[in-house]
């Protein structure tokens, strides 16, 4: 059955009685519950995926010196990695990755309570990372994979030779990609013996799991307001580069109020 529903426009949007609104809201609620149950089922299937053992000894530059992947866990069992697009000699990080990262500092205390350490990883030097991190005002841990195969092995950085073919390995397929760096989120687990396992990675739109603002936008009448934008995220800026948001418009006078002027 085709369940596609065309989006109603803001102009001339249907306005109905309270009873009819409630009836349609309950219909949507059933769909929302269906989606939530599917979400829960997919999460169970994600946790049930087999793991792959990390055999390579990845070493990262951190503010505390050289650290292995196992040491990035900081005593916890689970490591959540944002593959942040900030390449060597870049003037600044990717705006979309920055939009993701803007959600991070507030959630880290909660992640730690569930045995999860968060870290961002980029190929830029530690000095380049520190400069951009300070500009953004972020506090989360961010390390450099410079000199390591880590980014290449997890298919979020591409060699000139790979790019020259016109097809790179990204998001579990071969596709054209316009840049040498790509976004992603990866998850790792460390057992009692200290062995590290790769349990999950997501790319492309999968990284929206870190974009909580999108979830709130999806509740509003205009949604993400990206339908007429060729590149859906081209509106995103670094949080210190937005033009001032439009001022709230004064409420229009109701007809009965206007007549009392």
Positions of PLM-derived features:
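Non-globular targeting/processing and membrane-anchoring segments
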Residues: 1-114, 131-137, 141, 148-261
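Catalytic nucleophile loop
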Residues: 112-129
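Residues at the C-termini of beta-strands that transition into short coil/loop
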Residues: 122, 144-146
